[in-house]
Amino acid sequence: MREEIGSFHKFCGALNGRVISEFNYRYSGENNAQVFVGVKVISDDDRERLIAYLTGLDYRVKDLTESEMAKSHVRYMVGGKAPSLTEEQIFRVQFPEKPGALYAFLTHLGGRFNITMFHYRNHGSAFGKVLVGFQCSDSDCNLIKKILDELNYPCQVETHSEAYKFFL
């Protein structure tokens, strides 16, 4: 996916309200982001229509539905250290498991911040555990926390976590 402020929001909007079961996104350079997304479809035909629709919007789509390696391993490996990324802030956030929660979050951000990383997977509980990165200064952390508070999405800043420093 092309990496620019608002591209994540635009992609989620292109899904037209479909249920997202998993979303792994990582900035991987000035103009590129790696995305691994699980979207609920009702049939093989529905999946093919979605792929054609997204391809028509210039998204590069690779259907990994039948890949056991992707389902068992690759989904957890999207990302790594982002080259040339400065001022990244990491948040661990609880999203309510309800339709539109992600889109509401992106809409409230209003294109003010470049999202550099996003990891979510539906585990069937009342809240989804999300890890999200923003390209922003330390001082902008308070604004992001305020936005999350307004949405009632509890969060914890993880920028100084050893796991983040070592792997991401």
Which ranges hold each PLM region?
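A conserved regulatory-domain signal marking ACT and ACT-like small-molecule sensing domains
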Residues: M1-L168
